[in-house]
Amino acid sequence: MVLSATDKSNVKAAWGKVGGNAPAYGAEALERMFLSFPTTKTYFPHFDLSHGSAQVKAHGEKVANALTKAVGHLDDLPGTLSDLSDLHAHKLRVDPVNFKLLSHTLLVTLAAHLPSDFTPAVHASLDKFLANVSTVLTSKYR
């Protein structure tokens, strides 16, 4: 799914509003995912998955940093996320459906924190962006 110029602008503007809250929002999205989709916990058997866990916060920050990097390279997501794609496909062997689940909980988190900025157009653009990120992260599973 190709991001239009409007999509790219919406994604950059929305992520700009996230700003320094990105690590906290990443952790919150992970917590939402673990609560809403308990099977996702199986990929984190060594984590303390309780609310406010330092491990969840640290992984949320990794997720947020990867997305921030992706937002800065919207025209080269495959090149930008290649290492993460290798990691998730070959070492971690994460079921591809989990990227969709995290994308969903991230959208919910952003909508909750940025209600006036989370217009239908921004929602659609962020959804397309996260779908593209998910596609790239699962591209090396074949």
From Swiss-Prot:
<dbReference type="InterPro" id="IPR009050">
    <property type="entry name" value="Globin-like_sf"/>
</dbReference>
<dbReference type="GO" id="GO:0042744">
    <property type="term" value="P:hydrogen peroxide catabolic process"/>
</dbReference>
<dbReference type="GO" id="GO:0072562">
    <property type="term" value="C:blood microparticle"/>
</dbReference>
<dbReference type="InterPro" id="IPR002338">
    <property type="entry name" value="Hemoglobin_a-typ"/>
</dbReference>
<dbReference type="GO" id="GO:0019825">
    <property type="term" value="F:oxygen binding"/>
</dbReference>
<dbReference type="GO" id="GO:0031720">
    <property type="term" value="F:haptoglobin binding"/>
</dbReference>
<dbReference type="GO" id="GO:0004601">
    <property type="term" value="F:peroxidase activity"/>
</dbReference>
<keyword id="KW-0813">Transport</keyword>
<feature type="modified residue" description="N6-succinyllysine">
    <location>
        <position position="8"/>
    </location>
</feature>
<feature type="modified residue" description="N6-succinyllysine">
    <location>
        <position position="12"/>
    </location>
</feature>
<feature type="modified residue" description="Phosphothreonine">
    <location>
        <position position="138"/>
    </location>
</feature>
<feature type="binding site">
    <location>
        <position position="59"/>
    </location>
    <ligand>
        <name>O2</name>
    </ligand>
</feature>
<keyword id="KW-0479">Metal-binding</keyword>
<feature type="domain" description="Globin">
    <location>
        <begin position="2"/>
        <end position="142"/>
    </location>
</feature>
<feature type="modified residue" description="Phosphoserine">
    <location>
        <position position="103"/>
    </location>
</feature>
<keyword id="KW-0007">Acetylation</keyword>
<feature type="modified residue" description="Phosphoserine">
    <location>
        <position position="125"/>
    </location>
</feature>
<comment type="subunit">
    <text>Heterotetramer of two alpha chains and two beta chains.</text>
</comment>
<feature type="modified residue" description="Phosphothreonine">
    <location>
        <position position="135"/>
    </location>
</feature>
<feature type="modified residue" description="N6-succinyllysine">
    <location>
        <position position="41"/>
    </location>
</feature>
<keyword id="KW-0408">Iron</keyword>
<dbReference type="InterPro" id="IPR012292">
    <property type="entry name" value="Globin/Proto"/>
</dbReference>
<dbReference type="GO" id="GO:0031838">
    <property type="term" value="C:haptoglobin-hemoglobin complex"/>
</dbReference>
<comment type="function">
    <text>Involved in oxygen transport from the lung to the various peripheral tissues.</text>
</comment>
<feature type="modified residue" description="N6-acetyllysine; alternate">
    <location>
        <position position="17"/>
    </location>
</feature>
<feature type="modified residue" description="Phosphothreonine">
    <location>
        <position position="109"/>
    </location>
</feature>
<dbReference type="GO" id="GO:0020037">
    <property type="term" value="F:heme binding"/>
</dbReference>
<feature type="modified residue" description="Phosphoserine">
    <location>
        <position position="36"/>
    </location>
</feature>
<keyword id="KW-0597">Phosphoprotein</keyword>
<dbReference type="Pfam" id="PF00042">
    <property type="entry name" value="Globin"/>
</dbReference>
<feature type="binding site" description="proximal binding residue">
    <location>
        <position position="88"/>
    </location>
    <ligand>
        <name>heme b</name>
    </ligand>
</feature>
<dbReference type="GO" id="GO:0043177">
    <property type="term" value="F:organic acid binding"/>
</dbReference>
<dbReference type="InterPro" id="IPR050056">
    <property type="entry name" value="Hemoglobin_oxygen_transport"/>
</dbReference>
<feature type="modified residue" description="Phosphoserine">
    <location>
        <position position="139"/>
    </location>
</feature>
<feature type="modified residue" description="N6-succinyllysine; alternate">
    <location>
        <position position="17"/>
    </location>
</feature>
<feature type="modified residue" description="Phosphoserine">
    <location>
        <position position="4"/>
    </location>
</feature>
<comment type="similarity">
    <text>Belongs to the globin family.</text>
</comment>
<protein>
    <recommendedName>
        <fullName>Hemoglobin subunit alpha</fullName>
    </recommendedName>
</protein>
<keyword id="KW-0561">Oxygen transport</keyword>
<feature type="modified residue" description="Phosphotyrosine">
    <location>
        <position position="25"/>
    </location>
</feature>
<dbReference type="GO" id="GO:0005344">
    <property type="term" value="F:oxygen carrier activity"/>
</dbReference>
<dbReference type="GO" id="GO:0005833">
    <property type="term" value="C:hemoglobin complex"/>
</dbReference>
